[in-house]
């Protein structure tokens, strides 16, 4: 017999995710998955590097428990090198600032446990990744407070901060932090330095935590104001009361995640305790040499960016070809778009999902991300070219589009694509 806690948690999960759960169970292995946010474009090179490291560096000691609290010394040192090289933080990241875990979600679970009590709340811009609710509501009894922001209408830092402040004032629960996803999932955009600094100041004034989820920090390929990563900002805001926390699940290597807190030793220790013995020692041995070799990783990152840019261009061209409303991605592995302007209800949205599934293309619906307006969908483009084009063709069939996109469009002399550009949201 399950505990009361388990029964209540399971009931909540089955109700909250009943639509996506209802789409599972297909016996077909010919479906093309455009719903799951994974990067397949750099996998051959990553797999080769991991195999090489396993063969060259794996020792009998790696079959034992990992030494150290928060991660092995080798892995913590490699992660420190990684952050300092790629993000150039004002305050260098030291091994003692880092805690490793089994993945970004796992680390986020324990982090929310440490900064929130039952019934507390976290501010988060909507739409947002659905599993944020798993880490907050399911695991910790913490409420997510959606902050409705129309980024295509408001580009001012003050306007965005005002939206967070309004959401905080209108909620009945105690707000303990701001959950910041940058690059954003599912929009695929990056907020400006001005906005980030304004949000950090807001958190300091409100005496709440700033939690920065940056899992796509290295997958940036388009126009943006912020170089990559947020660690170079916020030095003047760092304090134990308003700790700047970075959660990064390495977007090239899904073999774990880590948390960084540079000013809160108490939080770092608590996180190290909660995540102790969670990360496989063998995984650490395979990943550490890659993260610690800046030259090797730079090559992989550059190659990944080239492939991501090409794939994103195809996704954008598809949306332009059919005159769809979309958010132009500059980071991440997906595009956020409307497959139909005649989608007005959640049932309409789910009907489109089912149609696409029937034709062998799995897509993510806006309701999965707490999008307030029905009709938005997330399509992952970081898969092999032929699979992505086939997936798009299946969507065309499902939607009844009269014309077929073949992956090519004529470019103007200015480099812009000939399309209905007025329907594009450039979110930078």
Curated annotation (Swiss-Prot):
PTM annotation (N6-(pyridoxal phosphate)lysine): residues: 254
Q: Which family does it belong to?
A: Belongs to the class-I pyridoxal-phosphate-dependent aminotransferase family.
Which keywords label this protein?
Answer: Aminotransferase, Pyridoxal phosphate, Transferase
Please state, per the UniProt record, what induces or represses the expression of this protein.
Expression is regulated by the cluster-specific regulator verZ.
Instruction: Please tell me the species this chain comes from.
Output: Clonostachys rogersoniana
What would be one Pfam family of this protein? Aminotran_1_2
Q: Provide the cofactor list for this protein.
A: pyridoxal 5'-phosphate
Q: What pathway does the UniProt record associate with this protein?
A: Mycotoxin biosynthesis
Any Gene Ontology biological process: amino acid metabolic process
Q: Which InterPro entries match?
A: Aminotransferase_I/II_large (IPR004839), Ethylene_sulfur-biosynth (IPR050478), PyrdxlP-dep_Trfase (IPR015424), PyrdxlP-dep_Trfase_major (IPR015421), PyrdxlP-dep_Trfase_small (IPR015422)
* Phenotypic consequence of gene deletion: Completely abolishes the 11'-deoxyverticillin A production.
EC number(s) per UniProt?
2.6.1.-
The name this protein carries in UniProt is Aminotransferase verI
Any GO MF annotation of the entry: pyridoxal phosphate binding
Instruction: Briefly state the protein's biological role.
Output: Aminotransferase; part of the gene cluster that mediates the biosynthesis of 11'-deoxyverticillin A, one of the dimeric epipolythiodioxopiperazines (ETPs) from the verticillin family that act as mycotoxins. 11'-deoxyverticillin A is required for normal conidiation. The nonribosomal peptide synthetase verP is speculated to be responsible for condensation of amino acids to form the carbon skeleton of verticillin, whereas the cluster-specific tailoring enzymes are involved in further modifications leading to the production of 11'-deoxyverticillin A.
